[in-house]
Amino acid sequence: MTDTRRAILAGGCFWGMQDLIRRQPGVVSTRVGYTGGTNDHPTYRNHPGHAEAVEIVYDPERTDYRALLEFFFQIHDPTTKDRQGNDIGTSYRSAIFYLDDEQRRVAEDTIADVDASGLWPGKVVTEVTPASEFWEAEPEHQDYLLRYPNGYTCHYPRPDWKLPKRQATA
């Protein structure tokens, strides 16, 4: 492996997101944390405006940003604002924190494909916003579902979920 790339995604409680994303081919490492908020050095008990997020390091020779986003849209409901399952509030919003213009373009294009697909009953409300500082969460939140396999999660892969690309317009 010569180089790696990063992605930062938020889609509800970071425990379930990390557990599923870490298993994807090409994912080298993950860590959970907080981003997109107003305070420095946020904690689980004090992270105003921050989303619970997962920082993903991946091998671009084995996967790409689009594939990660397609899986992201499969494992959480991107049509509910500030909510995933029983978790409610801005901490649990759906967001893509892009690191460069190419990630922004791919994110917007993927969202358009999700909206056009009809796979979700409503319109995607996922935020696409520039990445800011990613603050690593406390150790007890890292790899939580590896340590507590029956712990809480509201994330799961949807069977037979395949995102088609929109038809090009003439």
Curated annotation (Swiss-Prot):
Q: Which UniProt keywords apply?
A: Oxidoreductase
Name the enzyme group at the top EC level: oxidoreductase
- SUPFAM superfamilies of this UniProt entry? Peptide methionine sulfoxide reductase
In the UniProt entry, which residues are flagged as the active site? C13
Query: What role is this protein assigned?
Result: Has an important function as a repair enzyme for proteins that have been inactivated by oxidation. Catalyzes the reversible oxidation-reduction of methionine sulfoxide in proteins to methionine.
Assigned protein family: Belongs to the MsrA Met sulfoxide reductase family.
PANTHER family named in the record? PEPTIDE METHIONINE SULFOXIDE REDUCTASE (PTHR43774), PEPTIDE METHIONINE SULFOXIDE REDUCTASE MSRA 2 (PTHR43774:SF1)
What is the protein name for this chain? Peptide methionine sulfoxide reductase MsrA
Q: Which organism is it from?
A: Nocardia farcinica (strain IFM 10152)
